[in-house]
């Protein structure tokens, strides 16, 4: 079984790739140095070398926190590629084999938008819509599509967004932020237990932090 895990040199991607090592015969990991999803030529080169897989984990770093009126045109275009079009191209050109899985890593902010993370909110939500739209076609080949929407997880990105992760954790329902290992184990458990009927869903992974119902 082959797995491709994007942005897996650290953070959530690494947590997933580390767990998949024990159940996958081949795990292809990428970092920003060998796959920059904001560079479509780089994405095309990667895809040309990776035509198919059993497990595809679509994951990428997020944009900086910025006020809407301060976001430049070049930033809109960069993160359009990084968060949206790169995934479109990958999904169009890397075949996920029958019985496989597609995991999309987004954010709980797609349902509860953060005004400082507008680029992340809108582009992640747009691709979530694409994956949902394709779910029924993928289901015909027993390919399950699962969107995981993490809340505060202990990653470099979170540490760049907040001043004190430990203090943030104290304000959360569980008294802590989540760990990348937890997400990795969750993904592994779905694959390892051959859970197929769970598809076309967005799963909150936020320790009860979000306020929305569905």
For every predicted segment, state its role.
Residues 139, 144, 198-200:
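Short, small/polar-rich loop/turn modules that mediate ligand/substrate recognition or access, typified
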Residues 57-65, 208:
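Conserved NAD(P)H cofactor-binding loop of Rossmann-fold oxidoreductase domains
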Residues 188, 199-214:
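Short C-terminal tail/terminal secondary-structure segment
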Residues 62, 69-89, 103, 120, ...:
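Catalytic Tyr-X3-Lys loop
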Residues 140, 147-171, 213-214:
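A glycine/serine/threonine-rich, flexible loop-to-helix segment
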Residues 101-140, 152-153:
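Catalytic loop of short-chain dehydrogenase/reductase
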């Amino acid at each position: 079984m082959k797995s491709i895990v994007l942005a897996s040199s650290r953070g959530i991607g690494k947590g997933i790739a580390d767990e998949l090592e024990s159940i996958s015969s081949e795990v292809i990991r990428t970092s920003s140095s060998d796959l920059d999803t904001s560079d479509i030529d780089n994405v095309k080169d990667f895809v040309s070398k990776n035509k198919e897989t059993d497990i595809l984990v679509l994951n990428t770093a997020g944009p900086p926190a910025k006020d809407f009126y301060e976001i430049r045109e070049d930033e809109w275009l960069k993160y359009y590629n990084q968060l949206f079009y790169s995934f479109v191209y990958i999904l169009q050109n890397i075949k996920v084999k029958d019985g496989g899985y597609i995991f999309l890593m987004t954010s709980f902010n797609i349902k509860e938008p953060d005004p400082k993370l507008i680029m992340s909110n809108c582009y992640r939500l747009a691709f979530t819509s694409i994956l949902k739209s394709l779910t029924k076609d993928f289901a015909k080949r027993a390919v399950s599509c699962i969107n995981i929407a993490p809340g505060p997880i202990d990653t470099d990105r979170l540490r760049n967004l907040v001043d004190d992760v430990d203090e943030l954790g104290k304000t959360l329902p569980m008294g802590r932020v989540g760990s990348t290992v937890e997400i990795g184990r969750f993904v592994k458990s779905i694959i390892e237990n051959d859970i197929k009927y769970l598809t076309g869903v967005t799963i909150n992974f936020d320790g009860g932090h979000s306020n929305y119902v569905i």
